[in-house]
A protein has these predicted regions:
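Boundary/linker segments flanking structured domains
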Residues: 1-59, 63-76, 82-195
Length: 195
């Protein structure tokens, strides 16, 4: 059934994706992924305290590298936290990933919203929405258990339309360069309008 689905054609001119006030229908947001830093066996991370950049918490991706793995920089887990230093001291899923042979590292995503400055509460909600969308998009290789069975935007907090650009570290091409969410997938019928 999925082979018949295709993306709905909203036109190639993205400047037409504006509302009546001339604002984008899909709110632009950029996630700049930092180079991964190794998570030590005890859960410590050699990250500087960048409280100004991360004052509303962290969006992160755990990355696995193992010598016998067929792929490099495999994204294993997407998450959010308010304190990176404490988060990995006792996190059952991360402990399980970290206990495997090979290296486990973390890449922190710095979120920016061109033209707007979300307040603390709005930034926390934005972080939650982005985490959910990334889990939904990257689900195939992830160890995440939560947020995999509910469509983003359908939970208790609702959701918004986003045009997400991922820059910085590219995870060997495994992180999509751009995610436009939500988008419509359609199964077209045979067109019988021609005479």
């Amino acid at each position: 059934m999925r082979k018949r689905l295709r993306l709905a054609d909203f036109g190639e001119d993205e400047t037409l994706w504006l509302n009546g006030s001339g604002k984008p229908l899909f709110r632009p947001v950029e996630i700049c992924w930092r180079d991964p830093v190794r998570i030590e066996r005890d859960g410590s991370i050699a990250l500087e305290n960048e409280a100004d950049v991360y004052k509303h918490g962290y969006l992160y991706a755990l990355v696995r590298n193992h010598g016998n793995q067929a792929t490099r920089n495999r994204i294993a887990y997407i998450g959010i936290t308010n304190d990176l230093q404490k988060r990995f001291k006792n996190h059952p899923k991360v402990d399980q990933i970290r206990s495997m042979a090979g290296e486990t590292s973390i890449s922190v995503g710095v979120i920016s919203t061109p033209g707007t400055r979300p307040s603390g509460t709005a930034m926390v909600q934005l972080r939650e929405e982005l985490e959910h969308i990334l889990i939904w998009v990257l689900w195939d290789d992830l160890w995440n258990d939560r947020k995999t069975f509910v469509v983003p935007g359908q939970g208790g907090n609702g959701g918004r339309a986003w045009d997400i650009s991922n820059t910085g570290f590219v995870f060997s091409g495994r992180m999509p360069k751009r995610i436009v969410f939500p988008w419509a997938a359609i199964e077209p019928r045979r067109n019988n309008t021609a005479r």
